């Protein structure tokens, strides 16, 4: 009987509800009257178009206009017209084409919002400044430097007619076997919290500069537990109790939200067997309700298709769980029609659809897209700016780590040092992933790295 009593206490503890509540300290203008007026005049077709995000090489501006699409992206290795060596003007021209294809509701243009993975510089663009990856920036422990880097990246992204980046990654890697460990600042949640917060402030600006001309929309990612998967398996299962999930992997998101991050990306991984894209408890109950996140949740690359019972072109479960935008690179048209049918059939409620569209339009309003901000009209070119290169050099210097000091430091500037090893002259591997292509590899050699 005594054993049974202790077992009941133990399992009762495991099942106890964890309180994630925390006031959102980000105080932004309330645009609900403006947004609700637009939504009240939208058709179901226009609303569904807002929640679909295709990749630029699978949709034309003309198609985007027909389907009233709200967002697009270029993935790692995605370029205008599939031309890797596209010029800055090529990027801006494509941005203009999509902008001009934006849907209108009662004479109000709802600009298409373009997102990109500018994770260590504007890394898909030839000539952009490349900064060290987060694992190196974490070694600097320099919050002011991280904030400056965020500001530099924002200017380079803006220079190509884009105003949204899917960064920073605020994962808290717990197993170095994870192939994306290099995208995290540290295994220490406190350090990840501080550096992630400052990168967001650098990207978006703050105070009167919040999302002003030289700043872009940040995305905190990936929610939640991407750095804690069993055996470090990418997109695997994070098997931890809820207290650990909150205090380790969730900690950086509190600071991100308080710093006015208004887009968060859902994660590929599962938590205790349930895919994050289909986890209503985490996305809606925890993130949107308890943590008071009032921005939008964007899915990851076909992440919804990994939810049980779903496919890339069909997943009401993810949307009902709290994902506001489907990132669906290729199968966007089939997903559009399936989702529209599901709304008409009541599988997805109109109230849930309106909530998602409201979040999307509010973000666009905060970004100034309804108030004269035209991304492709950005009139300066900061791509590869000399001051940014100096900043990148500073980041490299401050991030270097000597693993074993046998009277090596301080280094004598009058001596010569031999750098050996295959990677010493492999610029591609030194740059790492997310550089020109997703895996950081070119197919023509290293002429693109200077």
Can you name each region flagged by the protein language model?
Residues 3-12:
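Sec-dependent N-terminal signal peptides
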Residues 16-450:
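Glycoside hydrolase catalytic-domain context in secreted enzymes
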